[in-house]
Amino acid sequence: MFENKSKLTPLERFWGLIHPDRKEIKNVYIYAIFSGIVNLSLPLGIQAIINLIQGAQINSSWIILVFLVTLGVAFNGLLNIFQLRIVENLQQKIFTKAAIEFAYRIPRIKMEQWQKKYAPELMNRFFDIVTIQKGLSTMLIDFSTSSLQIIFGLILLSFYHPFFIIFSLLLIVLIGLIFRLTAKKGLETSINESTYKYKTVHWLEEVARTTLTFKLSGDSTLPLKNTDKVTSKYLEARESHFQILLKQYGLMVAFKVMMTLGLLAIGGILVMEQEMNIGQFVAAEIIILMLMNSIEKLIRSLETIYDVLTGLEKVGAVTDLDLEKSEGMDMEKDCSECGMKIELVDFNFRYPGDQKIILKAINL
């Protein structure tokens, strides 16, 4: 499930995570597309209803339109339920696969890989699987659905007047620039924050492991001093990450205000110039409200996306460790009768990453 390759980017790890379940994820996106299209039935239906009311045509057509709009809302809710079911299955599968993979890999990791690592502390990374589980729902449902609704909403607005086309293209470019300019730094600060989070947990585990030593030493201040040190580092890292989030939130809010002002102004001018009727204007305002709601979801999902990508990077601290080779001799079967002879000629040994040779020119 998790790629066993070094120096994978968090995004590459994410694609590796979802690739085995691409069929289910494809269904989630299909439901999201249909949901985005069905959502547009609400403003279009209301536009048609207002036009009928203005024309004093309150007849069976009006009743049918009301029924169809209500049916569209219900169908959209049903699509969301289908999405939730698929994502829940994926979450359960991710947890199960991760647990099995950890259990398989841990006994097979090369011994030299543990020389500079503390295995029990490294297993804390498994808790990031829960973060990935919860965040996957946001990424696959909220983020994708909101993005599609923004695109579909802007496309629909473009049919009302060519001015909306230019405005929509400008807004899409601005969203892309916001993510491009801030996403990389946000991920870096999120990973740094997570690093100090685990250092804090590791120190607390060490205090718990050596609790008898601290009791016998009397009123030791070491637990509090070191806790204060690692916690301060965590708070610094968290504040750095929050500043990036704050910057992104600010830019998205500015984008939201600009979009609201622009769309309302263009719509109002078109109504006064009689290039749009009241029904179209009301429908456009409903679309704008839907776009605002989608942008709010995008803003709220940013931190979750960082958490998922950071979690994958932290889980990689275990899954990237090299495994022992499984091929070789079956000593019990091949050597039970004849025995086995081992000969060393000019044998040298040093630990991985160290320059100093521990054993040199050994002959046996």
For every predicted segment, state its role.
Residues 22-42, 51-96, 104, 115, ...:
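Transmembrane-helix motif of ABC transporter permease domains
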Residues 46, 107-152, 209:
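Juxtamembrane loop-to-helix connectors within ABC transporter transmembrane domains
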Residues 32-33, 65-80, 141-192, 265-276, ...:
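Transmembrane helices of ABC transporter permease
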